[in-house]
Amino acid sequence: NRNFLRF
């Protein structure tokens, strides 16, 4: 995902 550890 876009909000998971900068990804």
Swiss-Prot record:
Predominant location category: secreted
Membership in a protein family: Belongs to the FARP (FMRFamide related peptide) family.
Residues annotated with Phenylalanine amide modification: F7
A Gene Ontology term for the protein's cellular component: extracellular region
Keyword Iron assigned: no
Record's keyword terms, sorted: Amidation, Neuropeptide, Secreted
Annotated protein name in UniProt: Cardio-excitatory FMRFamide homolog NF1
Function as written in the Swiss-Prot or TrEMBL entry: Increases the rate and amplitude of spontaneous contractions of semi-isolated hearts. Increases the amplitude of excitatory postsynaptic potentials in abdominal extensor muscle.
Protein source organism: Procambarus clarkii (Red swamp crayfish)
Coiled-coil residue windows: none
Cellular compartment(s): Secreted
Cystine bridges: none
GO terms classed as biological process: neuropeptide signaling pathway
